[in-house]
């Protein structure tokens, strides 16, 4: 919204009133976010959170089993929703990203995106659906187990 500085009503700057209104209305966390955050602490909210965590742990188990089968070093997945693996065959993290994308249409996050120390590592998320995660794990084993 553009309100010219020169625009006044009753000797008051409409621009200044608009800025005051917007900064007051948007000061702090919005009402809908506050209500959503409070819902976490209800019985239903707790049930849903625990169900989501159960799904994420199941997804992690599928990915970790695939990496175990392949003998690839990894960490995470047990107490975090991410699994970090070492890229196979000394591949760079972006090269591995491209390889997975083109060969089996599976994606993750190249470690180099987190800084130079991440080069040679790759991060998988467990936030996908169980079906997609199982399929990704199956495809990983099929591709890298050759």
Where are these regions (language model features)?
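PLP-dependent class I/II
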Residues: 1-146
């Amino acid at each position: 919204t553009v309100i010219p500085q020169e625009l006044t009503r009753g000797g008051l700057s409409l621009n200044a009133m608009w800025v005051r209104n917007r900064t007051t209305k948007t000061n702090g966390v919005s009402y809908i976010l506050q209500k959503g955050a409070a819902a976490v602490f209800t019985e239903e909210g707790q049930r849903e959170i625990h169900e989501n965590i159960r799904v994420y742990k199941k997804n992690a188990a599928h990915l970790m089993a695939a990496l175990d089968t392949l003998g690839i070093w990894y960490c995470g997945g047990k107490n975090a929703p991410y699994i970090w693996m070492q890229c196979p065959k000394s591949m760079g993290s972006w090269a591995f990203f491209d390889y997975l994308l083109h060969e089996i249409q599976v994606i993750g996050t190249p470690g180099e995106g987190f800084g130079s120390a991440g080069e040679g590592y790759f991060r998988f998320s467990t936030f996908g659906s169980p079906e997609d995660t199982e399929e990704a794990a199956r495809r990983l084993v099929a591709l890298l187990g050759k």
